[in-house]
């Protein structure tokens, strides 16, 4: 009985994956890929602002910029992207997904902890979270005013 349940779940997941991969607008994948490549390139260039052992300003800038733009685009979606969902996915999932980097942020916090840089760790974490939420909110409000 348990084996039959798992088999039907696997078939259901496979069907959903097949549906996503082959029956969705396939150009969407190309746009997300291009957006992701551009976001990753910008993220790489911004990372040069980081210094060894110093405050990771490049990661902070990338993440806060991404939070603001994501908020802005959330509000502008209705006005400007309703007829262009593929472009919205290219910008949000592709570009902003590659630009912002939660995993690097976490790794930098662990690095600070390992090097007993507790003040810097606290400052970085609080700044990232508080200003990330604030900038996302400002982006939503600004975008709402523009649409």
UniProtKB/Swiss-Prot annotation:
Q: Name one GO cellular component term.
A: plasma membrane
Tell me which Gene Ontology terms the entry assigns under biological process. cellular detoxification of fluoride
Query: Which protein family is named in the record?
Result: Belongs to the fluoride channel Fluc/FEX (TC 1.A.43) family.
**Major subcellular site:** membrane
Q: Which UniProt keywords apply?
A: Cell membrane, Ion channel, Ion transport, Membrane, Metal-binding, Sodium, Transmembrane, Transmembrane helix, Transport
Q: Name one GO molecular function term.
A: metal ion binding
Q: What is this protein called?
A: Fluoride-specific ion channel FluC 1
Topology term for the membrane: Multi-pass membrane protein
Q: Which reaction does it catalyse?
A: fluoride(in) = fluoride(out)
Report activity regulation.
Na(+) is not transported, but it plays an essential structural role and its presence is essential for fluoride channel function.
> Which Pfam families does the annotation name?
CRCB
Is the keyword Ion transport assigned to this protein? yes
General function of this protein = Fluoride-specific ion channel. Important for reducing fluoride concentration in the cell, thus reducing its toxicity.
